[in-house]
């Protein structure tokens, strides 16, 4: 599998490969790919998401033999976004989470609460205290599960990736969104990626060794 940061680059790689006479496909069900006669070119979001065909299904996950991740720094940024749930302020999920935390946030930091929730100041942000997040863990999960459907894609694709560590996640509230993100990235959930026999990372520079550790 050849993985790139976005769908525009998928098209670019496919066009160049065909020009060079290399057999490639964008279809994971392609016969030639299934029989190791063609390289699957896809985006990192296709590999890493809450319903990935490469490890998040109960059965029938697509195995990965060798995987090349091109522009690993950009792909790492995309992976971090995949593991974050961003809930827009216009949604009912946002309103219910604000209502859940309202009383404690007023007591914890009344000025920030007024700026963000009442005055809608987009320049401000507020971290939900970890003790309040853990105390409300079950109620948070109920709200996220309530809106865990294809109409709420951020929750739909993100929750399966972080639900196991939801209790220790950070939650940042702004006037425009709520962002829920884990302390670390658990790529073991993408089992086929974890079990790939060979992983190759490509970048113009790999000065930051943590990138390799992050994707090991």
Segments the model singles out, each with a brief description of its role:
Residues 26-36:
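Short acidic low-complexity segments
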Residues 63-66, 71-216:
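Conserved coupling segment at the C-terminus of the helicase ATP-binding
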Residues 32-34, 57-61, 191-194:
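Conserved catalytic network of the ASCE P-loop NTPase/AAA+ motor domain
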Residues 15-19, 54-57, 81-84, 214-216:
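Short, glycine/charged-enriched secondary-structure capping and boundary segments
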Residues 1-24, 46-49, 208-211:
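Conserved Walker A/P-loop ATP-binding site and its immediately adjacent core
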Residues 35-52:
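Conserved two-lobed SF2 helicase motor
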Residues 49, 54-65:
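Phosphate-binding/switch loop-helix module in NTP-utilizing enzymes
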Residues 2, 40-42, 67:
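Hydrophobic positions in the central parallel beta-sheet of the AAA+
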């Amino acid at each position: 599998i050849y993985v790139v940061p976005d769908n525009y680059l998928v098209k670019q790689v496919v066009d160049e490969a065909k020009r060079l006479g290399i057999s490639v496909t964008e279809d994971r069900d392609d016969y030639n790919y299934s029989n190791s006669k063609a390289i699957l070119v896809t985006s990192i979001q296709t590999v890493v998401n809450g319903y990935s065909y490469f490890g998040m299904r109960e059965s029938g996950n697509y195995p990965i033999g060798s995987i090349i991740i091109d522009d690993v720094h950009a792909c790492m940024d995309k992976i971090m976004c995949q593991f974050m749930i961003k809930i827009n302020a216009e949604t009912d999920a946002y309103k219910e989470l604000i209502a859940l935390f309202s009383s404690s946030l007023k007591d914890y930091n009344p000025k920030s609460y007024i700026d963000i929730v009442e005055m809608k100041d987009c320049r401000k942000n507020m971290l939900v205290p970890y003790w309040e997040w853990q105390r409300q863990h079950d109620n948070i999960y109920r709200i996220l599960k309530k809106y865990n459907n294809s109409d709420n894609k951020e929750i739909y694709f993100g929750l399966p990736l972080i639900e196991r560590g939801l209790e220790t996640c950070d939650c940042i509230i702004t006037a425009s969104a709520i962002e829920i993100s884990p302390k670390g990235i658990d790529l073991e959930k993408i089992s086929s990626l974890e079990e790939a026999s060979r992983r190759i990372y490509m970048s113009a520079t790999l000065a930051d060794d943590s990138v390799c550790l992050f994707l090991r």
